[in-house]
Amino acid sequence: MASFVPTKQFVGASSSSDIGSSRLVSLQLPSKFSSSNFHLPSRPSQLKRLEIQAAGSTFGNYFRVTTFGESHGGGVGCIIDGCPPRLPLSESDMQVELDRRRPGQSRITTPRKETDTCKISSGTADGLTTGSPIKVEVPNTDQRGNDYSEMSLAYRPSHADATYDFKYGVRSVQGGGRSSARETIGRVAAGAVAKKILKLYSGAEVLAYVSQVHQVVLPEDLIDHQNVTLEQIESNIVRCPDPEYAEKMIAAIDAVRVRGDSVGGVVTCIVRNLPRGLGTPVFDKLEAELAKACMSLPATKGFEFGSGFAGTFMTGSEHNDEFYMDEHGRIRTRTNRSGGIQGGISNGEVINMRIGFKPTSTISRKQQTVTRDKHETELIARGRHDPCVVPRAVPMVEAMVALVLVDQLMAQYSQCMMFPINPELQEPLQSSPESAEVTL
């Protein structure tokens, strides 16, 4: 029995006169799937074409973001669907965030030189969003595909080279394709829009910083989450708000960089002034959505929320956040070991989380590996790569957190704000003072 699928030329696929044609080609199943023991549902009507759709490139439910492009292709970007109309928006709103993510910023990042200049090609008119999909494009201008000639055959240890082949049977060799951190440009651009919506609508602020590089760990009590500023975070190349520990982290990265090696670390992210009530019980808890979003970033290997694993060493009486009434008559908690979320729903306190990143897998040291044709070999990877990803991961984490929160804000508004709220228990998702200053 034969099945029929439309075919398309892929990089690395076997050449054939049939490839690239618009007609259907027949794929013969192995003999063990003979017609005697393998049956497809019969269709009395004409044969229908099997549709194969790419998966995993779209994020969100109400505020939906699809990223596209590859590390050494023509460019990368995103399409944002579901952005509210009449939001003031220009390329400069996104560029400031893309510049924080941009490669080649310092000696502790990849030396690849890209301006990462973005262009909005749809979804805005006269400086305002129109409610239609917003397309953002960033060209690639500093590709060096020849750096990856050896890696077209030999798999980089702990990289996605092998697993992409295991899944698809074909992959983009140069720069890792979609598995490259360059894919995150689209996320950061969309995250800039999400951060602006959060700030204008509810006054919420998302900030992230580096809290660990290799064995250099910033003590939590050194940073006041209520008052830490973006200026403090951006005051050094490692994006640690404490100058003393920033120097120690930079030294740790320099030590492995000169040896052609790499290290990992931790990014801490906080959210201030987030409305209460975001998130839903059971399967779509707010911390679960945040964990999924952050763990979708390249090189992530761990996620902690609130007290995290340290909470497992406490008793209930030590861990519980006791309630009290503040001077404004609001219910608050005296401590914040819950990390601003209880029962999967935001409680109005500062949200805090930590995301662990592994050492960069592409290093210029000799490693044992195998080739695509299953021969053992040695590999010294070429190319330009970060000795530590965490300084540039800071805006990526902020972007993913902001995307989750805007999506949850829209969900809360549509589900729980349609009818009059219970003023004794619920708070309106009222606009921040900044939104009142926007002239439409």
Swiss-Prot record:
<dbReference type="InterPro" id="IPR000453">
    <property type="entry name" value="Chorismate_synth"/>
</dbReference>
<dbReference type="InterPro" id="IPR035904">
    <property type="entry name" value="Chorismate_synth_AroC_sf"/>
</dbReference>
<keyword id="KW-0057">Aromatic amino acid biosynthesis</keyword>
<keyword id="KW-0456">Lyase</keyword>
<dbReference type="GO" id="GO:0008652">
    <property type="term" value="P:amino acid biosynthetic process"/>
</dbReference>
<keyword id="KW-0028">Amino-acid biosynthesis</keyword>
<dbReference type="GO" id="GO:0009073">
    <property type="term" value="P:aromatic amino acid family biosynthetic process"/>
</dbReference>
<keyword id="KW-0809">Transit peptide</keyword>
<dbReference type="GO" id="GO:0009423">
    <property type="term" value="P:chorismate biosynthetic process"/>
</dbReference>
<dbReference type="Pfam" id="PF01264">
    <property type="entry name" value="Chorismate_synt"/>
</dbReference>
<dbReference type="InterPro" id="IPR020541">
    <property type="entry name" value="Chorismate_synthase_CS"/>
</dbReference>
<keyword id="KW-0150">Chloroplast</keyword>
<feature type="region of interest" description="Disordered">
    <location>
        <begin position="100"/>
        <end position="147"/>
    </location>
</feature>
<dbReference type="GO" id="GO:0009507">
    <property type="term" value="C:chloroplast"/>
</dbReference>
<keyword id="KW-0934">Plastid</keyword>
<protein>
    <recommendedName>
        <fullName>Chorismate synthase 1, chloroplastic</fullName>
        <ecNumber>4.2.3.5</ecNumber>
    </recommendedName>
</protein>
<feature type="compositionally biased region" description="Polar residues">
    <location>
        <begin position="118"/>
        <end position="132"/>
    </location>
</feature>
<comment type="similarity">
    <text>Belongs to the chorismate synthase family.</text>
</comment>
<dbReference type="GO" id="GO:0004107">
    <property type="term" value="F:chorismate synthase activity"/>
</dbReference>
<comment type="function">
    <text>Catalyzes the last common step of the biosynthesis of aromatic amino acids, produced via the shikimic acid pathway.</text>
</comment>
<dbReference type="GO" id="GO:0010181">
    <property type="term" value="F:FMN binding"/>
</dbReference>
<comment type="pathway">
    <text>Metabolic intermediate biosynthesis; chorismate biosynthesis; chorismate from D-erythrose 4-phosphate and phosphoenolpyruvate: step 7/7.</text>
</comment>
<dbReference type="GO" id="GO:0005829">
    <property type="term" value="C:cytosol"/>
</dbReference>
<comment type="subunit">
    <text>Homotetramer.</text>
</comment>
<feature type="transit peptide" description="Chloroplast">
    <location>
        <begin position="1"/>
        <end position="54"/>
    </location>
</feature>
